[in-house]
Amino acid sequence: MPIKSDKWIRRMAESHQLIYPFEPKQVRETPSGKVISYGTSSYGYDVRCADEFKIFTNINASIVDPKNFDPNGFIDLKANVCIIPPNSFVLARTVEYFKIPRNILTICLGKSTYARCGIIVNVTPLEPEWEGHVTLEFSNTTNLPAKIYANEGVAQMLFLESDEVCDISYKDRGGKYQGQKGVTLPVA
């Protein structure tokens, strides 16, 4: 599975709306100052976190059950910064909306800027023909509160091309997260 280059990413973003909104270059500074980088890199695309967050809390004594998820386990926040409690996690989403081609599998890796602070970003692969905003899971592995920034880079997407097209894509099998918008909670 060869990895796709910046040229391919730009071409697909422009002709097939692979990523929207799309930043064709790497951005490290905006009019308001330095930011954690986002946009196109040599062999990937650094996504931004939107300003919508769901902060995990245990104030409602919920049990985390992926087959019967209780949304009361989260507090909603709309802000430019989110503080993750110690040893806890937050859900967010990308600014960017993705449309993955049928012959592509997309892998997401966290940025080292956050990893070096004990903040881990987890995203499952974006499967062939999946589309939507990517729900981001941020884990604070430290004993201190940790900060994440909206509208700045948080993770990198790598696009891998298969040697042949799959028989059944995510769209074909009616994947439950197809077309998701906003921060999406677990669906059984």
Swiss-Prot record:
Class of enzymatic activity (EC top level): hydrolase
HAMAP family: dCTP_deaminase
Record organism: Coxiella burnetii (strain RSA 493 / Nine Mile phase I)
CDD domains: trimeric_dUTPase
The encoding gene: dcd
UniProt binding sites for dCTP: 111-116, 135-137, 156, 170, 180
GO biological process assignments: dUMP biosynthetic process; dUTP biosynthetic process; nucleobase-containing small molecule interconversion
UniProt KW keywords: Hydrolase, Nucleotide metabolism, Nucleotide-binding
The protein's name in its UniProt record: dCTP deaminase
One Pfam family it belongs to: DCD
Chain's role: Catalyzes the deamination of dCTP to dUTP.
Family indicated by similarity: Belongs to the dCTP deaminase family.
Assembly with partners or alone: Homotrimer.
Catalytic reactions of this protein: dCTP + H2O + H(+) = dUTP + NH4(+)
Active-site residues (renumbered): 137
Pathway given in the UniProt record: Pyrimidine metabolism; dUMP biosynthesis; dUMP from dCTP (dUTP route): step 1/2
InterPro entries referenced in this protein's UniProt entry, alphabetically: dCTP_deaminase (IPR011962), dUTPase-like_sf (IPR036157), dUTPase_trimeric (IPR033704)
Enzyme Commission numbers on file: 3.5.4.13
GO molecular function, one term: dCTP deaminase activity
Transmembrane segments: none
